[in-house]
Amino acid sequence: MTDNRATGWKIPLLFCGVILSIVAVAALFRAHAPEPPAVPQALLKEAKGIRIDLESDPEGQSWKARIASAASGFSTQADKDGRLGEIVLTTAENKRFDASCTAAVLIREDGLRDGLMRKIANAASADCASLPWGVFAMHGMRDPQAQAEASALLTQRWKECHEGRE
C-alpha cells in the first residue's frame, strides 16, 4: 500500500521561510542614510517652518508652470535635469528659494543635484533672513560631505547674524 497523504506543501513552505530569513537579515544590515549634520536649533526650527506654496502669487505660479514643463515631456532624464538646473540657477540668483528647492528636488542625477543644492545654500547664506532656505537645501543633498560643508557654512553665518542678540 502507498501513502497518499498530501506532502507537497513542505517545499513551498521551506522556500518562503528561506526567503523571509534572507529579507530579515538584509534589512538588519542595510545601510541607513546618515543624519544630516547639526545646525543651530533655532535655525533648524525656522527651516522646519518653511512651507512652499508656489500658488500664492503670480510669479510663483509662473515658476511652477516652468518647473512642471521642464520636468515632463518625452525627453531624456539628462535633458530634464539640465532644464531644471537652469531654473534652479535662475531662481536662486533671483532669491526665489521656494522655486529653487522645488526644481532641485526633481533632479535625479545626484552629482548635479548636490551641486545645485550647494549653490542654493550659498545664495541663501548671503542674507540672514534666507538662511533657513540654506538648511532646506542642505537636507536635500545626498552627499554627506556636501551636507557637512553646507552645515558649517550655515552655522557660521547664523552665528554672524545673531552675534550680540543673544
List each model region and its residues.
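Non-catalytic tandem-repeat scaffold regions and their flanking low-complexity/translocation tails
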Residues: 14-166
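N-terminal Sec-pathway targeting helices
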Residues: 4-18
